[in-house]
Amino acid sequence: MRLPSIATLFHPLQSFSIRGGIHPETHKHLTSECEIETMPMPALIRLPLQQHIGAEAEPIVKRDDLVLKGQLIAKARGPLSANIHAPTSGRVIAVGHFVAPHASGLPVPTITIRPDGEDKWGPHLPRLRPENAAPEEIAAQVAAAGIVGMGGATFPSAVKLNLRAKYDLTTLIINGAECEPYLTCDDRLMRERAEEIADGIGIMARALGVKQVFVAIESNKPQAIEAMTRYNRALGYTFKIHVVPTQYPMGSEKHLVKMITGQETPARALTADLGVVVHNIATAHAVHLAVRYGEPLIARTVTVSGHGIRRPANLRVLIGTPVSEIIAHCGGFTEEPDRLLLGGPMMGMPIQNPRVPVVKGTNGILALTAAETPEAKTMPCIRCGRCVQGCPVGLTPFELNARIHAGDLEGAAKVGLMDCLACGCCSYNCPANLPLVQSFQFAKGKLSERQSRKHQQEETKRLAAARKAREEAIAEAKKQMMLKRKAEMAAKKKAEEAAAAAAMPPPATATAIQGEATP
């Protein structure tokens, strides 16, 4: 079938302005023309039980169990959690702890599988026909497949798909902005799998019951724009391809909503309050595979880049594959990297141990050289305001930083500390090279710690008060019981005395006695 040209399908849409933002060097040329290739089977697969926002999954396998590809090995613990499946067939060699793919490097509960090389599938999830499926069925299938937000947030996707029960939803926005420097995995996915992505978008739109769908793509991805424009229809929906400016952090959920709809999401509110739900491009692709083919989320596309990587690439990688094996597949390091990151350079997570695994939210592995991360001497703040100009939330980072360093964390919270996205725009703009984001993250952690401690203290007081109230109630109940028993005993005694008195013969009268005495 001959597809219509992009000129007949694509029309620029109205965009609304957003505040702040920066334009860092993108470095996307390193991998933008690298087609997605399949990463070979790793020697070991390590699956942390918490690859998502919410409660960690509960393991349902044990050491030495044989598992099949796609088999459920850890089940969601409650609605805000996610299932985890075996990415290939093999043997479970450990259900214990391993280093987290996190800057802390702390051990976390992990299932380790040694692949058997057969890559043998177990039973798939039941396939659905989304044209006839109820919204609840689609959401349940997405939950069963363990799908989470694959742009990095890792929020369980089924929870979002069920929002129609609580909110009046009108709009679905698919986030294909991919604004982080270096990363091109979503770009390549749109260029190579546009038809499958479109189907996933249609499935999600049907589940949400929205009236309109936008696909947001940055202007520096013309081939992706063309591909998605050609496949802009599915399940009765026609998607509007919205080309957004190449600007960081354009991929931020609330900024996309403002750019496309003109609506400002209030602080601590949800975009669903405005009738809008945002999902990632890769999430749409995972939904397509889960609903149409019954495949759980066991693999994802990852960009491997940076001048420290000998052969930058876009790879289709099994979840749980060690970063070290991926780097080796890409030819190893060109030199010892100055920074090794999971994710992008702005919001990515530095790691010390390359043996950590790729998880569901891992969209990039970056090995940055010293030339890419130049160290600059920090100087005192000159209150130039460049951090304010860059902040997409409209905060005053220099004031936040001053309050934090003065120990006034509550004061920093009052001027918006908890609204910080940790996007890094302020640090990027700062001529004094101050580590603003690190300062804000530290302060947010301290505040959260204080609030947690305060909550624990209040909970302890509440429990103590409740215990005291229970003890007083028990004591009062005992007192009342004793009083009641005493009253009952007194009444019983009185009744017995009355009965005894009634049973005695009446005393003889004087007249009667005299009469008895007369001869």
UniProtKB/Swiss-Prot annotation:
Co-factor binding comment: Binds 2 [4Fe-4S] clusters per subunit.
Pfam families tied to this protein: Complex1_51K, Fer4_7, RnfC_N, SLBB
Record keyword Protein transport present: no
SUPFAM superfamilies per UniProt: alpha-helical ferredoxin (SSF46548), Nqo1 FMN-binding domain-like (SSF142019)
Protein localization: Cellular chromatophore membrane
Function of the molecule: Part of a membrane-bound complex that couples electron transfer with translocation of ions across the membrane. Required for nitrogen fixation. Involved in electron transfer to nitrogenase.
Keyword Translocase: yes
Any one Gene Ontology molecular-function term assigned to this protein's record: electron transfer activity
Co-factor(s): [4Fe-4S] cluster
Tree of life domain: Bacteria
Family that this chain belongs to: Belongs to the 4Fe4S bacterial-type ferredoxin family. RnfC subfamily.
Ranges of residues in domain 4Fe-4S ferredoxin-type: 372-401, 411-440
Any one Gene Ontology BP term: nitrogen fixation
One Gene Ontology CC term in the entry: plasma membrane
UniProt binding sites for [4Fe-4S] cluster 1: C381, C384, C387, C430
Protein name: Ion-translocating oxidoreductase complex subunit C
Triggers of expression: Expression is reduced under iron-limiting conditions.
Classification lineage: Bacteria, Pseudomonadati, Pseudomonadota, Alphaproteobacteria, Rhodobacterales
Keywords from the named record: 4Fe-4S, Electron transport, Iron, Iron-sulfur, Membrane, Metal-binding, Nitrogen fixation, Repeat, Translocase, Transport
InterPro entries listed in its UniProt record: 4Fe4S_Fe-S-bd, 4Fe4S_Fe_S_CS, Ion_transpt_RnfC/RsxC, Nuo51_FMN-bd, Nuo51_FMN-bd_sf, RnfC_N, Soluble_ligand-bd
Renumbered residue ranges of the record's region Disordered: 494-519
